[in-house]
């Protein structure tokens, strides 16, 4: 037509298999065979309790009619070109993964399974999302050419069936929740005194609770803080729901200019593993030393809890909680290039990893705290033609 240069509507649907055999989830090889240990369990008897009798123990029951993990895939897309300038590509995808091999956690031990809960193709997971790319290019004059491009991706997933046991609290279930989510305790600030500790639910999380430690919410109201009080504190995890990019190239006479930005959103960063609040006893980072709770700084709103000589003395503060949860969204000024063409070549200036804009300020939001940082680089060069 006068305005539409090209229009294509695409669609596909198929059933594919996956060779994932459950090894990553703890399954063993040769699942079609019962596995029995002859010296794994027993009892001790005798006058002096010095005689032990061992008996057989089934460690893995054979999987009957086990099969491949399967995926039903649907993709609907459109390719559109308008005004000989604008190109749009959009896709919607939906994947229903089933027959996932997992432990039958819903089977009670009273049926005689003990530690050998059977494996079965019961798991189900859904994935869906959209992808969009747009490119606009226009030659205004013989001296001026502009090219804009952008891309956007949004994805979601959730557990549909995990054959979970019957939990005493509904918030412990994973069914219906995202795969990449953040689970932990709900923090309620820092303890300011021993009196406050004595009048609060008991916290037995690996170390003796002292003033300056993190206080957690007793979600189930049983007077103690334990694994039953862990909830989904964010529907997002380290894998972002949204990823995007935006770039531009401009040519004017002998000059050329280009930039590109990329970023992600709906992403959570947990910083509870940073030193000295991780599993290793390293030096204190400067931003922690600047604002942590201490007897000389008994600020209940300090950014970081009290310190200890070893990580075992502060185990209460190292568990995952909202205290350590941060917004991991960011926009990165990825590349910049400016060039000038002359008769025998081109001279240029470019840069990579120019800047990062994010509410998270401690380190590069794309990296972990102990990773080597991305380098910011600038180059000046000359390209010669002979």
Residue positions per predicted region:
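Extracytoplasmic gating/loop element in the C-terminal half of outer-membrane beta-barrel translocons
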Residues: 211, 264-345, 351
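Extracellular/periplasmic, surface-exposed regions of secreted and cell-surface proteins
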Residues: 1-180, 320-386
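Conserved active-site-proximal loop/helix segments of enzymes involved in bacterial cell-wall
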Residues: 103-106, 225-227, 275-277
